[in-house]
Amino acid sequence: MVARIIDGKAFASGVRGRVASAVAGLEAAHGVVPGLAVVLVGEDPASQVYVRNKGIQTREAGMASFEHKLPAETAQAELMALIERLNADPAVHGILVQLPLPRHMDAEAVINAIDPKKDVDGFHVLNVGLLGTGQKAMVPCTPLGCLMLLRDTLGDLSGLNAVVVGRSNIVGKPMAQLLLNESCTVTIAHSRTRDLAGLCRTADILVAAVGRPRMIRGDWIKPGATVIDVGINRIEEAGRSRLVGDVDFDSAAPVAGAITPVPGGVGPMTIACLLANTLTACCRANGLPEPDFAEAGG
């Protein structure tokens, strides 16, 4: 048995296409254009690439893109003032502050200064609480993308055993909550978990989000399980640099029923879900029906 390869790149393209269609319809029917503001502080090379890609895809979807680039030495008060202006701007429906921030800034305070209704990253404490109580919330983009891929692959997730390896606020915890909201039986594993390999072998759904290259091997995986690899790790191998996930793909693929590759799996879903969240925020701000992007993107 060789696992079905879950093509996140193709699925994300479908989501972006549906977002673009909905944006065009929104403008034609109501004269409303969703707007996404992205704030970058400093000159982190990876962050610059992410921000550039977000701007390109935002504009391709027919949305307004507002990019604010501030020097690394910017005072936190100045950043807070910018966020306050964006909160008050009716043309801006989504606000994203690119992480990581410079060390002198309090990232938690900055994120919680964003209007929760415009918090398209889903990191504001109010959205975290709403998600945790099963209410309507802005959902973090990467876990939302993972859930879309799981629903497309498996259909109804209720009753399945899910193990999420990693307990970060950005991926692990919200992923576990989303799966719980889907009526899965969920276990969160972390660095102190005993017999991690044995626990992983109980999972019908295994989500790896630990940031350790190829940590999860094929003999950790239940035959036929669906494996979602969130990890993006750059390693040197055979004299060249390459990206690998948290799962050892070569040993996992013959065991799993379905698996996301790295690259081309979860990664493309993140920006697609950011666009979907921005559209959702725009619809909510204008009292309009929200498109449903929770199902298949193709």
Swiss-Prot record:
Pathway: One-carbon metabolism; tetrahydrofolate interconversion. Its EC number is 1.5.1.5, 3.5.4.9. The keyword Amino-acid biosynthesis applies. GO terms for molecular function: methenyltetrahydrofolate cyclohydrolase activity; methylenetetrahydrofolate dehydrogenase (NADP+) activity. GO terms for cellular component: cytosol. NADP(+) binds at G166, R167, S168, S191, I232. InterPro entries: Aminoacid_DH-like_N_sf, NAD(P)-bd_dom_sf, THF_DH/CycHdrlase, THF_DH/CycHdrlase_cat_dom, THF_DH/CycHdrlase_CS, THF_DH/CycHdrlase_NAD-bd_dom. One of its GO terms (biological process) is purine nucleotide biosynthetic process. The keyword Signal does not apply. It catalyses: (6R)-5,10-methylene-5,6,7,8-tetrahydrofolate + NADP(+) = (6R)-5,10-methenyltetrahydrofolate + NADPH; (6R)-5,10-methenyltetrahydrofolate + H2O = (6R)-10-formyltetrahydrofolate + H(+). CDD domains: NAD_bind_m-THF_DH_Cyclohyd. It comes from the Bacteria. Keywords: Amino-acid biosynthesis, Histidine biosynthesis, Hydrolase, Methionine biosynthesis, Multifunctional enzyme, NADP, One-carbon metabolism, Oxidoreductase, Purine biosynthesis. It holds the Pfam family THF_DHG_CYH. Belongs to the tetrahydrofolate dehydrogenase/cyclohydrolase family. Homodimer. Catalyzes the oxidation of 5,10-methylenetetrahydrofolate to 5,10-methenyltetrahydrofolate and then the hydrolysis of 5,10-methenyltetrahydrofolate to 10-formyltetrahydrofolate. This is Bifunctional protein FolD 1. It comes from Paracoccus denitrificans (strain Pd 1222).
